[in-house]
Amino acid sequence: MAFSDSAVSKLRAILGTENVLTAREDLIPYSFDGTAAIRQLPGCVVFATSAEQVSAILKLANESKIPVVTRGSGTGLSGGSVPVEDSIVLCLVRMDKILELDRANLTMLVEAGVTTLKVSETAEAAGLFYPPDPGSMKISTIGGNIAENS
C-alpha cells in the first residue's frame, strides 16, 4: 500500500506544507535510529509544534488506519523510532519548551522534544539535580528517553 496523497494533503492542512516531508531524500534520515541496523522508509515525516497538532495527526491516522511512529532525535539503539512501511513519523523535536518547574514538588513539566541537557541545566539552575546522564544528552530528547526507557 502506497502512502496516499489524500493523507499528505490532510497533514499539510493541519501542519503547513513546510512541516510535512515526503521526498525520498528527506525521508532517508528518518528511516533508522542510532544503530542504523534496521531501515525502513516512512510514508512521510511530520513535525508537530503543539499538543493540538499531535491530537489532530493521531485522529487522522486512526481514521485512515495509518501507523504512527514517534521520534525525538533518533539517538536510540533499540529500533524504537524506526518506522514501519507507509507510516507517519511524528517528529517531536520542535516541541521543545519547558513549561513549568515546581521546585516545592520537585517536578518539571516539559514538552517531548526538550533535550535531556536542557532539563538537566534547568534543574541545576533551580538548585536541583536530574540524575539520568546518557552520553547523548546534548541531543537526546525527554520524550525519547521515556519512550525508550533510557
Segments predicted by a language model, with ranges:
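Beta-rich nucleic-acid/ligand-interaction surfaces
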Residues: I139-T141
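N-terminal accessory segments
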Residues: M1-G34, E63-I66
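Short glycine-biased active-site loop of nucleotidyltransferases that positions the nucleotide triphosphate
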Residues: G34-A37, G79-V84
